[in-house]
Amino acid sequence: MSREIPRPPELQRDVDFWIRVYSQITTLQGFLHDERNLAIVYSTVDLPPTERPGSPVRRQLIDNERTRWADALREAAVATEQGAAPSGADALRALELWGADATPDTLRAAAEAVRFQLGQADRFRAGIVRSGQWESYIARTFDSLGLPPELAALPVQKPGS
């Protein structure tokens, strides 16, 4: 029995996205990205540290950025349909990100699929620190159950922490 967790190649772009969420950006940042193609990250949004999570100020900032990218994707769709280059920098960036997949229909659909993902790097690090006291117990338990030791990293972030 292989102890390695399978990683199908078709999931690699999604794995890479989540690695970035849990290692590069904190809960004071987030990615605006395509909800289906996680390789498409439009921008990183910096959130005001003085505002609570879910505050109206934060929500408005995220909504404004989401609208900005949805508008850029619609502009890129129209330009692509007309065989022209878009004039806006964001629309040009959207075309660059989508590459050969940048058809008018794809870009219009993407305009409706701009999603925000809050960073988790600070929570993840804190979870690793918290789990340190249980490390040897978890390792022994996983070994006795024949589970891959890499699974021990999964519970380091409890929801809502």
Q: What label would you give each PLM region?
A:
Residues P159-S161:
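Secretory-pathway/luminal and periplasmic proteins that interact with or process carbohydrate-rich
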Residues M1-P155:
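Cell-wall glycan-active module
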